[in-house]
């Protein structure tokens, strides 16, 4: 995949039926809905889906979710330090070259190159903000959505009981 050099404008259509494409963790993971009843997918959700697809395609991704983490790094700082070239730049402290850090990060990680990234870690003097050419806006459903909640009921005994009353 080539280096992204220009701003890219595009639209996408996502077809979702009988699914929760972007649950809200602050609302019991119910679907995100506008006040008018339209479904909403946040820009963060869309970027996560793009990152996951790029990761599946073999691209180096900096912001990996815990459930799709392929390098076993438990934080962004650990991932930055694990990269030999970028980690070496971080360790230079106040002598770090921000331009060199920018070049390394954009070369190494497709999502940094695409969406940008802020590198500001506790204990590091290198603070780096990278702007990417791809910006993502929230998506909304074409029609209002109906939210139905289904409760699961148990119809069998999981253990034997000593006495049954019929």
Where is each model-derived feature located?
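RNA-binding basic/glycine-rich loop and surface signature characteristic of RAMP-family CRISPR effectors
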Residues: 1-166
């Amino acid at each position: 995949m080539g280096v992204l050099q220009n701003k890219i404008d595009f639209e996408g259509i996502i077809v979702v039926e009988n699914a929760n494409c972007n649950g809200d963790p602050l609302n019991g993971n119910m679907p995100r809905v506008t006040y008018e009843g339209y479904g909403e997918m946040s820009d963060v959700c869309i970027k996560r889906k793009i990152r996951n697809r790029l990761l599946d395609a073999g691209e180096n991704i900096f912001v990996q979710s815990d459930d799709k983490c392929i390098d076993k790094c438990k934080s962004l700082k650990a991932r930055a330090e694990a990269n030999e070239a970028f980690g070496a730049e971080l360790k230079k402290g106040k002598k770090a070259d921000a331009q060199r850090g920018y070049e390394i990060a954009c070369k190494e990680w497709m999502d940094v190159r695409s969406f940008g990234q802020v590198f500001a870690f506790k204990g590091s003097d290198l603070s780096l903000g990278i702007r990417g050419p791809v910006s993502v806006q929230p998506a909304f459903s074409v029609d209002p959505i109906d939210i139905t909640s289904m409760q699961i009921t148990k119809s069998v005994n999981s253990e034997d009981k000593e006495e049954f009353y019929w």
